[in-house]
């Protein structure tokens, strides 16, 4: 294959600007898939992606195209647009030479557009803008061109103006890919094999399937390969490409993107970002992998049926293989038994993982309230990291507590600036700056505690801006904060799964809200149940669930009043004994309903 005619590129954009639709049109126009097999969101293979209309997983496909009597091979990598899946984007960019930047002609440059551009620049990629949805009545092409030129600094004089939905000017995109996307640099089939794993998944028949970009060398069936991070060796059983179905080939060569299997049954042997080389003729040093991403949000996942715990462990091992950003460890709870504590990149990431476990592995789950990673400095000089409120030390042992802050960039039309500023202040945000995108749109920058935006901030932002604002955030470090742990007590017993950490400014409101909700969610028992919220030994909120009353006088038809008094006293004593030894039954759905109501 002529290396000069290979083009490796990905498509990046803000969520809902038309990446997957453009991918569909490129697949269609190059006749990679027959018209009969063609469907919308072809590369979004997960049912969940189709339902939500978003891309969650990156996906690679090979397209063949002929222009001016030359045969071209395109490797297109479709990427997610949501801020939670930035890690997926960075992985796909490492396997490319260029990125098509799709911008919606009705919305212009959004917060996540800029974030993805910076990722592409970090990877030294050629950025090629494409303006989509030009057929819509509200499209303002000239304004969007100016935005791209001023905010990103790319000349837009010959930018393709397309409609991915109708197929308008899609052939211009193919021309610009041939003209502007560089062919693979220094790709040599005769050098030692050097291939980057940018994605993987587990197949029950083939074992681990690795998606790779070959930078140097050749890879064929029967080769002995070495995974450089773990120093483990395997014999290649199959290599091939996706177009978009898996298609096996005799070999893959430098510059190509494809897949490799080697009957790998040990899931832990494969790491996304690792380098594969030939075991008998290895390369000098591995490729620069990916920077390890840090989890932003932590939450406990527990099976509704404790018998499903082993199945949950298997499910977590397989999902981690396809989602390198997910972290987890096993934990136990007094109230819920065995489960896993997971670290996620954001709330959407958390929601997607939970839904995947329920759908793909048929394990109904209880999701506990999300938390962030706090730092505790103790009086004895120790430093502790706490992502689970139940593990927070006693208050008298804590010298100071730090919480993570994020830099929040909100892109919005002018008329919503006031409501957004008020919203950010209510969530403990600190105003930093206001910059202009154009005459009618601004970018507001705030520094805000991460714990404040992981609950309902995004929904409230959409509400006050009628859905017109977009946001992007990045972690900027830890700051000293006045935080306390709130324990929830039922009948005097702490329920570890309900503990939470709050800033002292909001602790009374939050405690009161949860206690009132629990009163409505927990069914009445034969004895009175006090529900208390406590900070240390101080009770800051209380509600009581009244006892169910059995009418012990029903069988007394008249008769002596002392007989009735005796029966009532016996009932009173029985209830005292029940209260002392009886346990409160918390329905499983209470935990998820508490979380839903918070949102």
From Swiss-Prot:
Location of the tr-type G domain: 4-185
Instruction: From the UniProt record, list the reaction(s) this protein catalyses.
Output: GTP + H2O = GDP + phosphate + H(+)
Q: Which SMART domains match?
A: EFG_C
Alphabetized Pfam families for the sequence? EFG_C, GTP_EFTU, GTP_EFTU_D2, LepA_C
- Record-linked InterPro entries: EF-4 (IPR006297), EFG_III/V (IPR035647), EFG_V-like (IPR000640), EFTu-like_2 (IPR004161), G_TR_CS (IPR031157), LepA_C_sf (IPR038363), LepA_CTD (IPR013842), LepA_IV (IPR035654)
**E.C. numbers:** 3.6.5.n1
Q: Name which cysteines form disulfide bonds.
A: none
List the subcellular locations.
Answer: Cell membrane
Sorted alphabetically, which keywords does the UniProt record give?
Cell membrane, GTP-binding, Hydrolase, Membrane, Nucleotide-binding, Protein biosynthesis
- The residues that hold GTP are 16-21, 132-135
- HAMAP family, per database record: LepA (MF_00071)
Its protein name is: Elongation factor 4
User: Which species is the source of this protein?
Assistant: Mycoplasmoides gallisepticum (strain R(low / passage 15 / clone 2)) (Mycoplasma gallisepticum)
**Name of the gene this protein is made from:** lepA
């Amino acid at each position: 294959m002529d290396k000069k005619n290979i083009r490796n590129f990905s498509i990046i954009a803000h969520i809902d600007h038309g990446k997957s639709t453009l991918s569909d049109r490129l697949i269609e126009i190059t006749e990679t898939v027959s018209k009969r097999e063609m469907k919308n969101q072809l590369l979004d293979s997960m049912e969940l992606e189709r339902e939500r209309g978003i891309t969650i997983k990156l996906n690679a496909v090979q397209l063949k195209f002929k222009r001016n009597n030359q045969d071209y091979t395109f490797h297109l990598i479709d990427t997610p647009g949501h801020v939670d899946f930035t890690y997926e984007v960075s992985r796909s960019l490492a396997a490319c030479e260029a990125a098509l930047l799709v911008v919606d002609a009705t919305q212009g440059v959004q917060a996540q557009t800029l974030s993805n551009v910076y990722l592409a620049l970090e990877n030294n990629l050629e950025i090629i803008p494409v303006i989509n949805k030009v057929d819509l009545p509200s499209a303002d092409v000239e304004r969007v061109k100016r935005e791209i030129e001023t905010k990103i600094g790319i000349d837009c004089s010959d930018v393709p103006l397309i409609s991915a939905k109708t197929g308008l000017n899609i052939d211009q995109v193919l021309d610009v890919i041939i003209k502007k996307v560089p062919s693979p640099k220094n790709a040599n089939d005769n050098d030692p094999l050097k291939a980057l794993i940018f994605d993987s998944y587990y197949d029950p028949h083939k074992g681990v399937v690795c998606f790779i970009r070959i930078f140097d060398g050749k890879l064929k069936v029967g080769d002995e390969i070495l995974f450089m991070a773990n120093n483990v060796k395997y014999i290649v059983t199959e290599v091939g490409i996706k177009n978009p179905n898996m298609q096996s080939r005799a070999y893959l060569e430098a510059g190509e993107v494809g897949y490799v299997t080697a009957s790998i049954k040990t899931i832990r042997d494969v790491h996304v970002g690792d380098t594969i080389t030939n075991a008998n003729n290895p390369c000098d040093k591995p490729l620069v992998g990916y920077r390890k991403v840090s989890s932003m949000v932590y939450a406990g996942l527990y099976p509704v049926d404790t018998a499903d715990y082993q199945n949950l462990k298997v499910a977590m091992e397989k999902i981690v293989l396809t989602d390198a950003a997910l972290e987890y460890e096993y934990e136990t709870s007094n109230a819920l038994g065995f489960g896993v504590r997971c670290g996620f990149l954001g709330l959407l990431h958390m929601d997607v993982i939970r839904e995947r476990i329920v759908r793909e592995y048929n394990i109904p789950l209880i999701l506990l309230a999300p938390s962030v990673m706090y730092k505790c400095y103790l009086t004895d000089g120790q430093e502790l990291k706490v992502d689970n409120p139940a593990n927070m030390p006693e208050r008298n042992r804590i010298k100071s507590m730090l919480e993570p802050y994020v830099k929040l960039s909100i892109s919005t039309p002018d008329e919503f600036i006031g409501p957004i500023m008020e919203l950010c202040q209510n969530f403990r945000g600190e105003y930093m700056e206001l910059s202009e995108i154009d005459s009618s749109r601004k970018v507001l920058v705030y520094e805000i505690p991460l714990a404040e935006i992981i609950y309902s901030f995004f929904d409230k932002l959409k509400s006050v801006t009628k859905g017109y604002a977009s946001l992007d955030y990045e972690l900027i470090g830890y700051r000293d904060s006045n935080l306390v742990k709130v324990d929830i007590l039922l009948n005097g017993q702490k329920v570890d799964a309900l503990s939470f950490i709050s800033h002292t400014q909001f602790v009374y409101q939050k405690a009161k809200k949860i206690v009132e909700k629990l009163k409505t969610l927990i069914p009445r028992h034969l004895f009175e149940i006090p529900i208390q919220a406590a900070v240390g030994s101080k009770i800051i909120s209380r509600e009581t669930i009244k006892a169910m009353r059995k009418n012990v006088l029903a069988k007394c038809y008249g008769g002596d009043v002392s007989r009735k008094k005796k029966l009532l006293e016996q009932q009173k004593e029985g209830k005292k004994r029940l209260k002392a030894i009886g346990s409160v039954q918390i329905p499983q759905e209470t935990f998820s309903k508490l979380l839903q109501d918070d949102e």
